[in-house]
UniProtKB/Swiss-Prot annotation:
Family statement drawn from the similarity comment of this UniProt entry: Belongs to the class-III pyridoxal-phosphate-dependent aminotransferase family. HemL subfamily.
Listed GO biological process terms: protoporphyrinogen IX biosynthetic process
InterPro entries: 4pyrrol_synth_GluAld_NH2Trfase, Aminotrans_3, Aminotrans_3_PPA_site, PyrdxlP-dep_Trfase, PyrdxlP-dep_Trfase_major, PyrdxlP-dep_Trfase_small
Annotated NCBIfam families: hemL, PRK00062.1
This protein's record includes keyword Transcription regulation: no
Essential cofactor(s): pyridoxal 5'-phosphate
Main location: cytoplasm
Protein's recorded name: Glutamate-1-semialdehyde 2,1-aminomutase
Keyword Glycoprotein: no
Source organism of this protein record: Desulfosudis oleivorans (strain DSM 6200 / JCM 39069 / Hxd3) (Desulfococcus oleovorans)
N6-(pyridoxal phosphate)lysine: residues bearing it: K267
Length: 427
């Protein structure tokens, strides 16, 4: 495909923006490409600056579960825009979205809106530390919880893509409180908490690990987290920024029936607008200022445009049959890709949960970050470039999930699988 305009725009952007992008994974370094510059999108399709049309499986990295420019979401935004963008004061939209979130997510009775997933996780950890009076934090290798200093330890997502073990500028004194354990390893968790439980404020986890390429929790892993954190007086935080309202209407905690103490949300609840949230029981959330003394604030938190988009999105997702259709289509894609690879003799591991999909170029099961990193990254890069040439827009990283939306049709899925058949044959 001709990408002359995108390349020219990237060259211009690189003079003004570090790396030419405002989030590192977009740069495409891991797959040997320069980034596409997007002109517009509609439904499940996205159009670049050169006019090339692609079937989109990035979905703005997860938020666009209804597809691009969904009529109900656009109408809600347009209505709010006529009244103003942001007021620095409360609107009824904040409580309306909060009610929808609380009704859907088992762990949430009260919720605080913020502007990003990173804000949500860093605020949730501060809350846990403030409540427990402890500093220790346990996370899991390959789980990415945003770019807050204490969380950039053995992280996934763009950190894994860039092969950066952490980041310069993160003080050693900050990360000394962070312990990172293997995902899906209950023995390691139990041993850690048995030794250091009285120092640990919280355990944070992606219940479905989308930021290492989409790895599902082993049976019993999440229940072990719940049991061990309760035993040692630690708070359990589910980072459902990615999985919330995507693997089920109530998130992974509803799907797996494990209730954490605090839940972090983002992406889908903003309908494509910048948003984040964290919530829990009234007993926990009463500690947040101004009701309590644990401080967190944000100028644009709860802004009306994001709230309106979120309300419209969740209203659509509540309709009967939505998640059944999403899951069926995601499974159709996963099964089709797996069959196409097998027919070509290309070893892959395909995982599907709800409307998320992971495809690893690996010859053995992927259950944690160590096994995810055995993937053939050069083969993935070749696959990515060839699929892009065939009009399939995937995340430019082996360690990112594939997102399916309600706008994807069986025809989109079949065209994607047919493209993959041709690509696998040449890998």
């Amino acid at each position: 495909m001709n990408q002359t305009r995108s390349k020219a725009l990237f060259k211009e952007a690189a003079v003004l923006i570090p790396g030419g992008v405002n989030s590192p994974v977009r740069a495409g370094k891991a797959v040997g490409t320069t980034p596409l510059f997007i002109d517009r999108a509609q439904g499940a399709e996205i159009v670049d600056a050169d006019g090339n049309v692609y079937i989109d499986y990035i979905g703005s990295w997860g938020p666009m579960i209804l597809g691009h420019r969904h009529s109900a979401v656009m109408a809600a935004i347009e209505t709010v825009l006529k009244r103003g963008l942001s007021f620095g004061a409360s609107t009824d939209l904040e409580a309306r979205l909060a009610r929808m979130v609380a009704d859907a997510v088992p762990s949430i009775e009260m919720v605080r809106m913020v502007n990003s997933g990173t804000e949500a996780t860093m605020s949730a950890i501060r809350l846990a530390r403030g409540i427990t009076g402890r500093d220790g934090l346990v996370k899991f290798d390959g789980c990415y919880h945003g770019h807050a200093d204490m969380l950039l330890v053995d992280a996934g997502s763009g950190v894994a893509t860039q092969a950066i073990p952490g980041s310069p500028g993160v003080p050693a004194d900050v990360v000394r409180h962070t312990i990172s354990l293997p995902y899906n390893n209950t023995a390691a968790l139990k041993d850690c908490l048995d030794r250091k439980g009285e120092q640990i404020a919280c355990v944070i986890v992606e219940p479905v690990a989308g930021n290492m390429g989409m790895v599902e929790p082993d049976p019993g892993f999440l229940s072990a987290l719940r049991k061990e954190t309760e035993k040692h007086g630690c708070l359990l935080i589910f980072d459902e920024v990615m999985s919330g309202f995507r693997v089920a209407y109530g998130g992974a905690q509803a799907r797996y029936r494990i209730t954490p103490d605090i839940t972090c949300l983002g992406k889908v609840i903003g309908g494509g607008m910048p948003v984040g949230a964290y919530g829990g029981s009234r007993q926990i959330m009463k500690h947040i200022a101004p009701e309590g003394n644990i401080y967190q604030a944000g100028t644009l938190s709860g802004n009306p445009v994001a709230m309106a988009a979120g309300i419209a999105t969740l209203s659509e997702l509540k309709k009967p049959g939505v998640y059944e259709a999403l899951e069926a289509r995601t499974r159709r894609l996963a099964d089709g890709l797996a069959r196409a690879a097998a027919d070509a003799g290309v070893p892959v591991q395909a995982h599907a949960v709800g409307a998320m999909l992971g495809l690893f170029f690996a010859d053995r099961p992927v259950t944690d970050f160590a096994s995810a990193k055995t993937s053939d990254l050069s083969r993935f890069a070749a696959y990515y470039r060839a699929m892009l040439e065939k009009g399939i827009f995937l995340a430019p990283s082996q360690f990112e999930a594939i997102f399916v939306s309600t706008a994807h049709t069986d025809d989109h899925i079949d065209r994607t699988v047919n493209a993959a058949k041709a690509v696998f044959a040449d890998l």
